[in-house]
């Protein structure tokens, strides 16, 4: 029994040693997942569930630290009883990743986002947001904070994007994007 236990520990240790990449290496990680998005100060609104998909590049600086940047299509906004505010962006996360345990990283960074779609949907009919509501800012800035776990090159990533800038170009409208994002990706060594 002791030999079996020792063999299992050795096997797990050898698998775990591949969970983090070598210093100086680059990886590409295509990923797909979902957003649970809302707008701060949007009274009586609910979260909009949407797609998050794209890719990130990562450079392993030291055994414990890496930097990453990427581009993700991100469906954001919020929902009301009979309407949906659709604010879709191309997010460009720039992150510092600290590996606190084998395969487990804590992330913090800055994320500019570029608006690619803004619509209101009311009772199934879709309207141009710029004509129907307040003008949306073309560029949004947020602070992503998150964690990820990598096993056999599969990466489960959860992060919260704190909106820093207002989503709309209006003195009366002070809403900011607030997005919880969870994705599953796969890292390829480059």
Where are these regions (language model features)?
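Outer-membrane beta-barrel channels and translocator barrels
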Residues: 21-23, 62, 101, 151-154, ...
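Outer-membrane beta-barrel translocator domains and adjoining extracellular loop/strand segments
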Residues: 40-46, 79-85, 118-127, 168-173
């Amino acid at each position: 029994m002791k030999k079996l236990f020792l063999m299992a520990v050795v096997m797990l240790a050898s698998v775990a040693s591949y969970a983090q990449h070598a210093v100086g290496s680059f990886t590409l990680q295509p990923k797909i997942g979902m957003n649970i998005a809302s707008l701060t100060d949007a009274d009586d609104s609910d979260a909009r569930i949407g797609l998050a998909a794209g890719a990130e590049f990562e450079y392993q600086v030291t055994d414990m630290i890496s930097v990453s940047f990427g581009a993700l299509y991100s469906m954001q906004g919020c929902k009301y009883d009979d309407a949906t505010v659709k604010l879709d962006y191309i997010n460009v996360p720039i992150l510092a990743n600290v590996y606190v345990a084998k395969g487990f990283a804590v992330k913090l960074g800055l994320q500019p986002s570029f608006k690619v779609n803004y619509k209101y949907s009311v009772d199934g009919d879709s309207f141009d947001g710029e004509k129907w509501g307040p003008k949306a800012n073309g560029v949004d800035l947020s602070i992503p904070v998150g964690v990820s776990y990598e096993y056999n090159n599969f990466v489960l990533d959860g992060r919260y994007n704190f909106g820093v800038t207002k989503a709309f170009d209006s003195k009366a409208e002070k809403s900011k994007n607030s997005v919880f994002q969870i994705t599953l990706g796969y890292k390829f060594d480059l």
